[in-house]
């Protein structure tokens, strides 16, 4: 029996082909969990889409089925955890995505699945349409503490965030990470996909508040909460109310 309550977001706002059309601005949508969809002037990018067949029960309906995605210019993957690198989701959309990007280790995993993935070093930049995308550092190598994963040593460079410069502003998704000093030394972004999980391998509540105060002009899109039905796991049970208390 669960011993903690779990915050649940409002009903899902579904979207379809209309969200992928050419537009004269940039739109950002939360996909649930740690995922994000960006349409910038008609260039369509998804990051960490976990849209089907997750191995735990969910609290919400996903806003779009991957089979209904008409086209993508790129899929970005921050790291190998299956709530971010969702192999079933990517297979369902591989025929409509022009490119897949991630850190080198994640790209190797994607290539093994048959995805035409591009691997990058932290700090590298590449362009997708009008968007310039740069990998930012992340500290999330929790696997090194688990015997199950001792087949390799997980390194900082296996995880990343994405800094996305669009014609209309800067979107930053730091990814799953402990708070790093580099996270507090970025230019002012316009939007942050904001993980506030109070977990030792995530930013932690105090770290999240520190980051929010460092970038007071940024709009915060809360993520990594209200998606997986796991009230006793602090990695999934963040509560937006805690940011106000």
Residue ranges of predicted features:
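Metallo-beta-lactamase
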Residues: 3-23, 102-168, 242-245
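Pre-active-site segment of Zn-dependent metallo-hydrolases
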Residues: 14-20, 37-80, 87-92, 142-152, ...
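Active-site neighborhood of phospho(di)ester-bond hydrolases with catalytic His/Asp-centered motifs
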Residues: 46-48, 71-83, 101-104, 172-175, ...
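Active-site-proximal loop/helix segments of hydrolase catalytic cores
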Residues: 144-214
């Amino acid at each position: 029996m669960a011993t903690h309550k779990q915050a649940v977001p409002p009903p899902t706002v579904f979207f379809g082909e209309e969200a992928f059309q050419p537009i004269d601005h940039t739109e950002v949508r939360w996909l649930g969990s740690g995922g994000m969809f960006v349409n910038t002037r008609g260039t369509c990018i998804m990051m960490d889409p976990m849209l089907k067949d997750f191995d735990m029960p969910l609290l919400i309906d996903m806003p779009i089925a991957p089979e209904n995605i008409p086209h993508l210019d790129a899929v970005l993957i921050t790291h190998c955890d299956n709530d971010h690198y969702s192999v079933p989701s990517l297979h369902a959309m591989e025929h409509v995505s022009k490119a897949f990007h991630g850190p080198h280790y994640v790209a190797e995993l994607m290539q093994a699945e048959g995805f035409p993935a591009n691997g990058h070093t932290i700090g590298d930049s590449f362009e997708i349409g009008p968007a310039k995308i740069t990998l930012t550092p992340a500290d999330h190598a929790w696997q090194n503490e688990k015997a199950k994963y001792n087949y390799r040593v997980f390194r900082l460079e296996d995880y990343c965030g994405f800094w996305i410069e669009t014609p209309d502003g800067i979107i930053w998704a730091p990814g799953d990470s402990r708070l790093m000093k580099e996270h507090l030394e970025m230019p002012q972004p316009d939007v942050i996909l904001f993980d506030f999980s109070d977990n030792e391998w995530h930013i932690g509540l105090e770290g999240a508040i520190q980051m929010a105060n460092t970038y007071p002009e940024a709009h915060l899109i809360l993520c990594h909460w209200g998606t997986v039905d796991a009230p006793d796991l602090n990695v999934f049970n963040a509560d937006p109310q805690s940011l106000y208390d």
